[in-house]
Each structure stands twice: as C-alpha cells, then as structure tokens.
Amino acid sequence: SVTMGGDLNNNQPGFKLNWVKILPIAFSAMLFGDSLSKLYYATVCRISDKKAAKDLQSSYLQKAKALVLKSDRKAMLQLLASAVESFNSLLPKERLERKKVGIVGEIFLKFHSFANKNIASWLTEHDIEVLPPMLTPFFTQSFVNRDAKLQNNLLKSNIPDFVFSQ
C-alpha cells in the first residue's frame, strides 16, 4: 500500500493474531534458527565440503518447519541436540582455529544476503568464521527498551507489568 502521510494505513480487521498461543513456538523457532546459524557458520569454515554443511542446515530447517507447524517446542529442543551432533560429525578431529568476523549494521542488511552483497558466503569461502547476527537479542531488546521508556515517562502501557516481569 502507498501512503503520503507519516503512517501506513493498512487496517485489516479480519487479521488477528493470538499472541499468547503463538509466542512460545515463535520464540522457540527464533532460538532454534539462531543456534542453527551459529552451528552452520562455525562448521562451514572448517570443512572442505561446504555443500555438506549447507545441505545439513537446509535439512534441519525443513525438519524445524514441520515442528513449528505442530507447535512442538519439546521436539524442537531435541532436534537442536541432534543438529549439534550432526554438525560436530562434519568437523575434522583436530581443532582448526579460524579468523572470526561479525556482520554488523542495519538489521535488513545483516539478514539479507543481496543487500550485504553475499558477504557471509564470501567469508566462508575464504575459511573465515562468520559470527552471524542473531534475531533473539534484537527482539528481546524491546523488553529492555520498554522498561526504560516507562521509567522515563516516554511510554504509557495498557499491558500489566507482570506480563513482562521475569
């Protein structure tokens, strides 16, 4: 939709999300994705068969997708344990130290390979370990930001504080 004003007016009254229902599996999926990304990048720079790591990553993403659709958080944790074993089995016996590089910048650039000119692929092809950007801290930071904004009277909330308390 196109707007000339300062906000995007795209009201869709029939589209409602039950956050209480989807938040647990969404958070589990985000943690799984972050962990799988770390496993992939730590492995791919240390092995000669880069395709094996990519295939393994794709396989685990497909398996996780099925579990997300069933909202099976416990099975996702078991799948992650299996992924750790599988990625570890690809590694050589001797520990190979690699240079490490993190991808920083605007979130869109960090997560969009075309926007960042496929820098992660280039780095891994040159046996440099990519410290991938994580989605979990990006989203959990909003809880910290919320507290700071409330304390500084920059935000009013209709949501009870116990929802956000630890």
Residue map of PLM features:
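An N-terminal assembly and electron-transfer interface module characteristic of large anaerobic redox
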Residues: S1-Q166
